[in-house]
Every structure is written in structure tokens, then in C-alpha cells.
Amino acid sequence: MSIIQMQQPDALTETILERAAKVAAVAATDAEAVDRAASFPKAAIEAARIHQLLGVQIPLEFGGEGGTSFDVTDMCYTLGRACASTAMIVAMHQTKVACLVRHGRGNGWHEALMRRLAAEQMLFASSTTEGQGGGNVRSSAAAVERNGTGFSLLRDATVISYGEQADGIISIARRAADAAASDQVLVALLKENYTLERTLEWETLGMRGTCSAGFKLKAAGSAEQVFPESYDKIHAQTMTPVAHLSWSSVWAGIAAAAVERAQMFIRKAARGAGGQLPPGAAHFTA
């Protein structure tokens, strides 16, 4: 697993929140166009790489900053005020990074991935839902097929957000072909490990820049890429709580920005009406 070292922005003398604000400024510039065209926010995500936001949770010993959930939620809130799509992409990515950090220690392959993620600021997507399972992420149809020191996986993913733009995918799967649907594992896949065949288009309302679509995911790699800890523990301890904290921070940021826009609109209308507020507008200008 080769590592490409990213240039350090100001030797990381700025805080995570200060860097997030700079990324938010880039994201805000393209936010309307991104949502209108359902296009990936390339400039904003590149800015997140440059300002080293994608690897903030990686422990210091693996080249990261040892960022906390508080850092992630502040980051997501800040980005949410600027561009909903950028913020949600970062939130989903950070949820997967949290799983890697908390459940990948002690596994040589996953520790090497942490080092690479910190160095290259890789972007990770996730594959958690399937055609047969709908939105139930605690039930998998596709199974990991082990072959000596390797594995293969064929998965009908109902939706993968920014799957074609990501550097890797974290996927859920059944532990084996004869395992129960709820006996699941988490697998870290690099771009060279898989192919994606688009099977379903999503015409989403909002957050269109997440580029969410259905795919047939065909993957193969080393058995070391499968997390040793069972997914039920990862789901309960990390995946669900971090996802909900990150997503809700994004939504809070979106809501705060919407209120600000409403306030500006009402104040402009009031100035044009000699200071008279529109009906029902007083609570927006408190």
C-alpha cells in the first residue's frame, strides 16, 4: 500500500474549525450550482484535502491529528451552513473513518490504511443498503466469499453516495454464504479492489451533490481487509452514534443558514416598505 505525502497547510498551525471555515468558503461559492446540476462538489472536497480535514480523526501515532467527535460535529455544522452536499459527504466519510480508527487497531492492514488516509487525505464512501434488505443495515444478503488469503464480494447496493468519486468504500456484508443475514462484517475496499456498475438513478430533493445512485459492487481483495470485530458491535458502538451526531450537525448548519437567509430577505423587504415587517416575520428578526 503506497503512501503519497500531502503538503501540510501552514504546518497545521490553524485549528480544525479554522480550516473548516476556509473549506466552507470554497463550498459556498459552488453550493447552488452543485445542487442544481447534482454535481459532485469537487472544489470543496479538494479544499478539504488541502486543509487536511479528511484525516483529522486518525490517531497521532498513524500520522493524523487525533481529532474527536466534537471536532467532527463542529466541522459538519460549519460546512452545513455553506453547502449541504459537501457537509453530508464529509459527515458520511467521517463516520467511516471513526469505524476504522476505533475498530481497526491491532490489524496491520487497517493500521496501514490509517497511515495512508492521513497522508493522502483519502475520501471514503459506504455501502450499507441492498436491494433485498432495503434500509435495514443490520441485514445483509451479499456474503464475503473467502478464498485462501483472499475474498470476493458481489453486492447489489441500493444506493452508494459519491461512489464513483471516492478513493475507497467501506461495505457491510454477511460473514459467509452460510451465515445468518444479521451475522455481518465490515470490509474496507480500496478503489483498485472493486468495480461499480450503475443500476439505479436517484433524483434526490436536496443534497444532490452527494451523487447518490444504485450500483452493483463487485470486489476482491485480501482477507485482512475484513474487520476482525463483528459488525453488530461496530454498528452499536460507532457507526450509528457517529453517523447521527454528524448528520444532525449538518442539518443544524443547514437550518441555521436558512434562518439567516430568511432574516436577510425580511430585512430587505422591510427597508423597502419603510420599516414595516411582512406579516408573521417578527420571530425571524429577533
State what each model feature region is:
Residues 2-58, 64-74, 249-286:
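Alpha-helical interface subdomain recognition
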Residues 42, 46-50, 55-157, 161:
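Glycine-rich flavin
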Residues 122, 138-140, 165-167, 183, ...:
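A generic structural signal for well-ordered coil/turn residues at beta-strand boundaries
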Residues 128-131, 156-157, 174, 189-192, ...:
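Fold-independent oxyanion-binding glycine-rich loops
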Residues 156, 199-202:
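Short beta-alpha junctions and helix-cap segments that line functional grooves
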Residues 158-163, 243-247:
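Glycine-rich phosphate/pyrophosphate-binding beta-alpha loops
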Residues 159-196:
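A short core secondary-structure module
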Residues 204-286:
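Glycine-rich beta->alpha junctions and the first turn(s) of the following alpha-helix
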